[in-house]
Amino acid sequence: MAFLMCAGPARPQSPLPAQTNQPPAQAGGVSEKGATGNPNKSGQDSTSASKPAGAGEEAASTRKLRLGPLDPSTPPTDVPHDRPIIGLALGGGGALGLSEIGVLQWLEEHHIPVDEIAGTSMGSIVAALYATGHTPEEMQHVLTDESVNSVFRITPPYTALSFRRREDQREVPNAITLGLKHGVSFRNSLLTDSGLNELLDREFLRYNDQTDFNDLPIPFRCQATDLNAAKTVTFARGRLQDAVRASASIPGVFRPFEMNGHEYVDGAVLENLPTPDIQAMRADVILAVSLPLQPVGKGDLDSILGVLNRAFAVAIENNEAQERKLANVVLIPDVSGFSSTDYLNTVPLSKRGYAVAEAHKAELLKYALNDQQWQQYIAHRAARIRGPAGTVLSVKVNAPQTDLKEIAEKRFAPLVGQPVDTKQIDALLAQVRGDGRYDADYTVGYDAEQPDRPILLVTISDKKTGPPFLDVGVNIAAQTGGVTRASVNFILLDQDLGGYGSELRTKVDVGFLTRIESEYYRKLGRTGFFIAPRAGISREPFYIYSGNARLSERLLQQGGTGVDLGWSDGRKQELRAGWQFQNINWTVDTGADTLPTYSGNAQKARMQYTFDSQDRALVPEYGVRVHTDLGYLYAAPNSTSAPQLFTELDSSRTFRKKNIFLLKAEGATMFNRDVAQPFRYTLGGPLRLSASAIDQYRGTDYFVAASGYLRRIRSLPAPLNTSLFLGGTYEIGQMRSPDAPTVSRQDVYFGVIAESPLGVISVGPAIGNGGEHKLVFTIGRLF
């Protein structure tokens, strides 16, 4: 992971001269390094062919900046004239850049002003926060463990998913998603960017999409790498969130930031320390915080990723050595013991930054102001901080489909006339993104006549790689002396087929269970109602037992079709009712038993309800999930018709962060009707009497209940956000049937449970009161 936190190799670049007499060529929005041109009186480069800011992409504000994204900018003019202008350059380095907060704290405590600031990568986030008026103490509250965990996510939170995507994640919790729109393609980043976007939108809400960065409380610049032009660019105006988002787009970790047909990634790829930007802003004194090249550790070069990581770091260091030469004072914090992924160590890393500033005290104090000058500096900076945003003036939505646009407008309409609530906006955007079909973000602008009332521009766009999408995962359940059930699972999804929200979902399982099942989910208007025809075939082995002795292996082959009419709120619940037709073959494959072979058709009328408020598909920490199926089996030859009722309840509750209490209850009844064997329920296996073999007991009426306790013994940091648990369960269950003795069992299970990219991995022994005992191992679903 350390490799992912480093930018790519640097391109050699000559340092700029110490004195510059011409205005620097920096972007309006973005400017290329080395561009030339003389601004005219309006601030527009007379030789520029670029369009005004926002051209090619709709802007939220009604008032536009005169300079376009690639037009040169001028140095700030609202700077001190009675003392040296002090500029600060903050370099990138992943989490190690958090040490820069401590440097800022030391500078403030010793009355050393920062008149201009620039940053790259993590340095751009710290620099932008400081430039907009955040104190070092406030930054530590912004960059908390909670916010870091929300930024570094491999997948969206389970609670942000739509109902159908939650179903998919529960079935294949370890899925790798492939896009099939342009052949087979993986996504272009390890992490999702919604958490990063939400953090930046929240902190920079007051600054709209037409901001001149010279007008911030501290004039600001940040760098990014233009992948199309293979150049470093400097953001000097436009939307502050976009500038920082581009600069912090670690290649391979976050997807590139796209603007006007160009894609931008971490500025550290070509220029990690933005001292040239500070020089171009005409600072008299340049201070720089540069993160050191870490020594090679034991085993660092023993893998491909380790070698790549070191190669990138060496390339960056070579270029950064030249950039340090432009600074009057270079601060290199001692960050030994930390890595570029230690984002949960904001305070300890800040202390390292404070310490390096203290070590350079003699060099820095000559730039300190007296108390009166410092108060004047603070007052001037505070006067440039924008006040809180007023109530929302309007919401505009851009979307690729008319239906989607109208639905989004309806969802966002209640925001008009209300104070801006970024959490509410993020929740609404999550609803748009929750089906996995679209990307969504928003921009804040202002009207020229009502400059204190924000305009929200919501932009919804198609994902580049799909639909269709293909999820691929595995599920394994194994027991000693029992059965190993392993399958590779596929979910093929073609969305908006026949209209917004409609989809064709095909599930394919290969392994112990072989299955192909397709459902066309067709929305009926915008009421939440739907119709869902389906068809499928399956082949699954079942083992027949007498007590604990296995008698035979039978094969259940099914093929059928059906249709449901239902309603869903799209988030937590779904109700459906329908009919299904099945053709069933139930035959002996190996061994011998006394059960009759069955072949024939059957029909079933059914009603299902599902409610899901749990927070995770792996090990839920809170919430409830209830699934109920009420049906009537009929028209089955050589079998009694029977009503059927099945209910499953899962509940989780966390106490003091490390203790999770689980309750699982499951039961079904055919009201003791003597139905044919292939229609009967089964019981046994992990968390369904764990000490018994999988599906060991067969009958018409059963229940099983399990209460469990998990103790979190270790938490893995972002982006994995997973945990390792020790725990156990107590299970009690019973199986009844009209033609066999009732079986009652009690089990205990204890073991290790780990959340992982492969799903839940569990291993542990189970002991039952009937002489049963098993060692249980699972990968994928939690039992």
List where the protein language model places each region.
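C-terminal outer-membrane beta-barrel translocator/porin domains of Gram-negative envelope proteins
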Residues: 434, 440, 455-457, 467-481, ...
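Flexible glycine-/small-residue-rich
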Residues: 224-226, 236, 333, 397-401, ...
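Gram-negative/organellar outer-membrane beta-barrel architecture
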Residues: 423, 428, 435-608, 614, ...
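Sec/Tat signal peptide C-region and signal peptidase I cleavage site
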Residues: 8-12
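Conserved active-site loop/cleft motifs that coordinate metal ions or position small ligands
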Residues: 288, 330-332, 725-729, 760-766
